[in-house]
């Protein structure tokens, strides 16, 4: 699977201020992949409350997209279930990505999992939104999710953030507990501290069907120039601090944009939140 980007509402987000992959219009995806005559399936992310899904997510038979990943917080579960059922009825594979579980109550997570379990979603994702979780925590979380998955016939996925340099460690820990869909990005590119690095994960999997050479070539030809052009992502002290405190990285993103280096003052500000 490869995710193109978001299916965001053009009523809520200005098309002139965001790139085309914030909206993933069908014609823009087809301009890249045509009819996608390959074995690779394509997915998009749809955030609860930020997507006009009834209008913007068209029937699967008219789309080159295969999967819709519904991203939700635990308190939005009823709306998430509506989105899941809508996408499933349109013919898509569907996952439910429950975000910010490190900030949620155990009872709320359990209730959310039961709701997704009873839905028609194909899979459920563990999401370490703030990059604050450690491998031993992922172990118990993965066991909870996989047990639920076995009960309801759902596969489990893992989406990690690299605030504490643990995205790779947490991803392979999840894999060792039976989690089967592992999110990764080239050179760990992603919001803030980034995600699990694809090149790391492929090296770990040691499966002969995976060829590292095209990946390295892709990094050379595309990712290095992107970095050199000024695109910023990856582990940095501000992201470590928000991850350590289990906070959203927005403050760290702003800190980095301002090119600040007063880490101690920044940490004090975070502690006061």
Feature map (PLM): residue ranges:
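Catalytic cores and adjacent flexible loops of soluble metabolic enzymes
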Residues: 1-273
């Amino acid at each position: 699977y490869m995710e193109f980007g978001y299916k965001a509402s053009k009523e809520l987000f200005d098309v002139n201020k965001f790139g085309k992959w914030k909206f993933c219009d069908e014609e823009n995806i087809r301009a890249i992949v045509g009819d996608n005559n390959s074995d690779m399936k394509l997915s998009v992310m749809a955030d609860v409350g930020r997507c006009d899904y009834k209008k913007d997510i068209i029937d699967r038979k008219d789309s080159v997209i295969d999967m819709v990943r519904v991203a939700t917080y635990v308190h939005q579960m009823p709306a998430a279930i509506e989105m899941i059922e809508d996408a499933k009825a349109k013919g898509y594979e569907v996952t439910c990505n429950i975000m910010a579980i490190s900030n949620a109550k155990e009872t709320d997570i359990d209730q959310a999992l039961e709701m997704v379990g009873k839905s028609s979603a194909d899979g459920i994702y563990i999401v370490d939104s703030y990059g604050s979780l450690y491998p031993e925590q992922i172990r118990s979380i993965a066991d909870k999710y996989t047990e639920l998955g076995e009960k309801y016939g759902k596969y489990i996925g893992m989406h990690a953030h690299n605030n504490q340099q643990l995205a790779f460690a947490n991803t392979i820990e999840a894999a060792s507990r039976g989690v089967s869909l592992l999110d990764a990005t080239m050179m760990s590119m992603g919001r803030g501290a980034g995600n699990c690095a694809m090149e790391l994960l492929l090296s770990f999997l040691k499966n002969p069907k995976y060829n590292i050479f095209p990946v390295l070539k892709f990094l050379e030809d595309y990712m290095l120039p992107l970095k050199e052009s000024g695109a910023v992502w990856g582990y940095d002290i501000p992201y470590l601090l928000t991850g350590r405190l289990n906070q959203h990285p927005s403050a760290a993103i702003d800190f980095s944009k301002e090119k600040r280096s007063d880490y101690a003052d920044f940490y004090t500000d975070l502690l006061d939140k």
